[in-house]
């Protein structure tokens, strides 16, 4: 198979868009990707499907004079969203959609892979088609399962995320944090239920929960550096069964978002302190569950990111945009905590929609523009 053309990449993207699958269920997507990859020039390609993560694909391109292995990651899963675009290539899987643009991500990766399979790079290139970015922390699972060992271990790692706010094909990046880290919060208050007329014989968890919720609102404003940024949102509270019975149990669910891992751990500790205080003050049991999984802040490596930005800024064919941090989460942050690297935005020119929207409709011109910009950077990075 020759280098994939723009029209071929668009057709691939449209087929991928038709077959979205949820985290760790990406069998049809995996098989379609593998069929395309096996059609590339295999002279210096090694393809690996890890048993530990069977919908993942690793492709290693052997360099002509390798000094390092450069990794490139793309995610492959979709979201439980009912598509409303009315496109002729809309999702054929009810209730599931590529509403975060991972079909664009995969198409760009295939474009890069097809080019370097025909034009042997100087350094080794490792392509990682990752399942389960939207949930289940596929990047963390891959690392902990040891699939990046031996010749499949990257010395540096790169990855993109589409951005509908940026023009099609524009590249956005910044030094420091690109995406926030996220942690799921579950708090269970366990007291004693009773008749509404006799509160002295009960232990009201609703009152305690109200106090705890108000105290949690002070964590960001009074415990976090105001120059930094963090968010705690408590989006769900469940308690009681009827108006005249004091609730013996209350559950609070929410999310933490922070721009550095240090900040997230600081917020975690403050929540622990507050929950312990409420437990003592109201004489009840308070269980706090914090689940970050692999959704660490995406903290770009300073040296590699300076190099990436410099190339993109000085390439007249690239529309480069210096971006601000986003409070959305991305599990590539876990991998960037293990390997130095850079994540960046690829504009897809759909400003009237947003990520995770049922109406997301990326401009397909972004695919070939993304391929060309990243291909140029990788060639430059290898010193060819």
From Swiss-Prot:
Disulphides: none
Catalysed reactions listed for this entry: N-acetyl-(2S,6S)-2,6-diaminopimelate + H2O = (2S,6S)-2,6-diaminopimelate + acetate
Presence of keyword Hydrolase: yes
One Pfam family named in its UniProt record: Peptidase_M20
Pathway(s) of this molecule: Amino-acid biosynthesis; L-lysine biosynthesis via DAP pathway; LL-2,6-diaminopimelate from (S)-tetrahydrodipicolinate (acetylase route): step 3/3
Any GO MF annotation of the entry: N-acetyldiaminopimelate deacetylase activity
GO biological process: diaminopimelate biosynthetic process; lysine biosynthetic process via diaminopimelate
Superkingdom of the source species: Bacteria
Key words, A-Z: Amino-acid biosynthesis, Diaminopimelate biosynthesis, Hydrolase, Lysine biosynthesis
Residues annotated as catalytic: 75, 134 (proton acceptor)
Residue ranges that the Swiss-Prot or TrEMBL entry lists as coiled coil: none
E.C. no: 3.5.1.47
Family: Belongs to the peptidase M20A family. N-acetyldiaminopimelate deacetylase subfamily.
Job description of the protein: Catalyzes the conversion of N-acetyl-diaminopimelate to diaminopimelate and acetate.
Listed HAMAP family: DapEL (MF_01692)
Protein name, entry field: N-acetyldiaminopimelate deacetylase
Organism per entry: Lactobacillus helveticus (strain DPC 4571)
């Amino acid at each position: 198979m020759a280098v994939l053309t723009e029209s071929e990449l668009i057709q691939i993207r449209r087929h991928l868009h038709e077959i979205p699958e949820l985290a760790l269920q990406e069998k049809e997507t995996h098989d379609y990707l593998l069929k395309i990859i096996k059609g590339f020039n295999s002279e210096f390609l090694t393809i690996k499907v890890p048993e530990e993560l069977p919908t993942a694909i690793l492709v290693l391109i052997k360099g002509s004079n390798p000094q390092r292995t450069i990794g490139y990651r793309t995610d492959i899963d979709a979201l439980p969203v009912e598509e409303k675009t009315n496109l002729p290539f809309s999702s054929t899987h009810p209730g599931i959609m590529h509403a975060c643009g991972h079909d664009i991500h995969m198409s760009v990766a295939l474009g890069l892979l097809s080019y370097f399979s025909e034009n042997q790079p100087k350094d080794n290139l490792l392509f990682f088609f990752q399942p389960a970015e939207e949930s289940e922390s596929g990047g963390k699972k891959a690392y902990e399962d040891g699939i990046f060992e031996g010749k499949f271990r990257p010395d540096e790692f790169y990855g993109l995320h589409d951005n509908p706010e940026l023009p099609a094909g524009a590249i956005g990046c910044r030094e420091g944090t690109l995406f926030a880290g996220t942690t799921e919060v579950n708090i269970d208050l366990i007291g004693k239920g009773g008749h509404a007329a006799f509160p002295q014989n009960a232990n009201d968890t609703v009152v305690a929960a109200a106090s705890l919720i108000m105290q949690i609102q002070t964590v960001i404003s009074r415990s976090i550096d105001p120059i930094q940024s963090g968010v705690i949102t408590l989006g769900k509270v469940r308690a009681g069964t009827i108006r005249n019975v004091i609730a013996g149990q209350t559950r609070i669910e929410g999310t933490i978002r922070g721009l550095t891992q240090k900040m997230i751990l600081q917020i975690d500790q403050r929540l622990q302190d507050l929950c312990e205080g409420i437990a003592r003050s109201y004489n009840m049991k308070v269980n706090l569950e914090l689940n970050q999984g692999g959704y660490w802040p995406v903290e770009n490596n300073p040296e590699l990111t300076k190099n990436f930005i410099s190339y993109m800024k000085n390439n007249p064919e690239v529309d480069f945009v210096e971006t601000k941090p986003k409070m959305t989460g991305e599990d590539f942050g876990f991998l960037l905590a293990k390997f130095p690297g850079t994540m960046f935005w690829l504009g897809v020119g759909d400003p009237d929609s947003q990520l995770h929207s049922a109406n997301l409709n990326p401009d397909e011109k972004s695919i070939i523009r993304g391929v060309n910009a990243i291909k140029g950077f990788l060639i430059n990075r290898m010193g060819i």
